């Protein structure tokens, strides 16, 4: 399920975000606790063996390995690999969320263009909304495990009321000669919805061909967005990229188990506190491994993690709200004057508590700048490189060269168009 924490961060106060660190569901602690335990156990075993079970020559040999690994640990470009990959994954996640679909536009247009209060008109509108919701459901069954568990068979879709038994028989009658994997029939409910608009227009429930075209365009847009969900599920990011990132992070900390071992004090020439717990390495593990877990969670938002998309809730919302929108809701309030009709300056009300909060209304950033008090003090002239000025100068030059008999006083006369300046 989606973990919503917006209520806890209504302000940017430090304490508000500090409290979020103690949340468990959907948290970084839940994501990395198993890896952290394994890392600390492995680190502790090697540390105990190094300090207690090795002879002094073996310790010195092991210390050489520690120094070798520590100096070359930075060869793994962890920040670059993680940063670039998380940018791609977040962009992909955002585009997927934009295409999962809310049915409101289709239903609002169906309610607007398919006119009538008769039972048949209502059935037309409800079928259009239901077929669009069915298109989304069929896609979600094949991309989301949560929806697949809810609707394991097409018979359960019928039992849930998204389609009738006759509609299922008609749906199953569309067969392909190819393998079933090449013949997914997501398009059938969308085609039914488009056919409903044609029949509604033919029966006179849609008043014009333009309204019919608008209705069909919105259904096509809905189907196209659902198709993008299929496309993203069909062609994920190249496998080698997640493999590379996962390999880089895990190898980095595998080497860190040795590279970050603290050398026994008596074997070193510099002073350093001998601690048994790798504090800074532990913090680094949390940040980098947590970064990797963020990528893994967002890579497939249709999975079953705490913060994956609520596909079942979206299906429920679309079918219930969609049917409600088209179910004879064309009645509008009586045409009345609003309470501000005769007021020149509208005075709006606030609750007593919120009335004390100051509002910042938009003003242009330079709208309050006053450069000159009087208009007469501003002299307006053409730009020095304007096209008009250049053409005028060329014309004057040509006149002086071609008409040598022009009166000397007229030759240098200021053009009338510029006298006002």
Swiss-Prot record:
The keyword Transport applies. It is a multi-pass membrane protein. The chain crosses the membrane at residues 28-48, 73-93, 239-259, 275-295. It comes from Caenorhabditis elegans. Forms oligomers. GO terms for cellular component: chloride channel complex; plasma membrane. Keywords: Cell membrane, Chloride, Chloride channel, Ion channel, Ion transport, Membrane, Transmembrane, Transmembrane helix, Transport. It is found in: Cell membrane. Belongs to the anion channel-forming bestrophin (TC 1.A.46) family. Calcium-sensitive chloride channel subfamily. The keyword Cell cycle does not apply. It comes from the Eukaryota. It holds the Pfam family Bestrophin. This is Bestrophin homolog 2. GO terms for molecular function: chloride channel activity. Forms chloride channels.
């Amino acid at each position: 399920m989606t973990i919503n924490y917006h209520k806890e961060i209504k302000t940017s106060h430090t304490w508000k975000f500090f409290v979020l660190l103690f949340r468990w569901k959907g948290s970084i602690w839940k994501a990395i606790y198993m890896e952290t335990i394994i890392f600390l156990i492995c680190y502790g075993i090697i540390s105990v063996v190094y300090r207690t079970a090795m002879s002094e020559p073996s310790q010195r040999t092991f210390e050489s390995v520690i120094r070798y690994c520590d100096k070359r640990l930075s060869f793994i470009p962890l920040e670059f690999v993680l940063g670039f990959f998380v940018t791609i994954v977040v962009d992909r996640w955002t585009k997927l969320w934009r295409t999962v679909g809310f049915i409101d536009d289709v239903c609002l247009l169906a309610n607007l263009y398919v006119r009538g209060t008769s039972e048949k008109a209502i059935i037309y509108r409800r079928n259009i909304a239901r077929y669009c919701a069915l298109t989304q459901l069929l896609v979600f069954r094949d991309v989301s495990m949560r929806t697949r568990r809810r609707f394991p068979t097409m018979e359960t879709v019928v039992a849930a009321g998204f389609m009738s038994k006759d509609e299922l028989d008609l749906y199953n009658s569309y067969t392909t000669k190819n393998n079933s994997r090449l013949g997914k029939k997501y398009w059938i409910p969308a085609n039914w919805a488009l056919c409903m608009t044609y029949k509604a227009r033919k029966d006179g429930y849609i008043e014009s061909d333009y309204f019919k075209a608008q209705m069909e365009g919105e259904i096509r847009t809905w189907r196209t967005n659902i198709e993008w969900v299929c496309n993203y599920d069909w062609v994920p990011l190249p496998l080698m990229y997640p493999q590379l990132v996962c390999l880089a992070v895990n190898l980095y900390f595998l080497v860190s188990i040795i590279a970050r071992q603290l050398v026994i004090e008596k074997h070193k020439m510099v002073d350093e506190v001998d601690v048994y717990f790798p504090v800074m390495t532990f913090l680094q593990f949390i940040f980098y491994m947590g970064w990797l877990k963020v990528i893994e969670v967002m890579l497939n938002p249709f999975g079953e993690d705490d913060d994956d998309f609520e596909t079942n809730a979206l299906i429920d919302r679309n079918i219930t709200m969609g049917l409600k929108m088209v179910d004879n809701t064309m009645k509008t309030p009586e045409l009345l004057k609003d309470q501000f009709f005769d007021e020149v300056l509208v005075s709006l009300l606030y609750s007593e508590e919120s009335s004390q909060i100051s509002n910042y209304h938009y003003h242009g950033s330079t709208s309050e700048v006053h450069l000159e008090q009087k208009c007469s003090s501003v002299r307006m002239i053409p730009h020095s490189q304007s096209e008009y000025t250049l053409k005028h100068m060329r014309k004057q030059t040509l006149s002086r060269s071609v008409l040598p008999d022009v009166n000397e006083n007229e030759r240098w006369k200021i053009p009338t168009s510029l006298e006002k300046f």
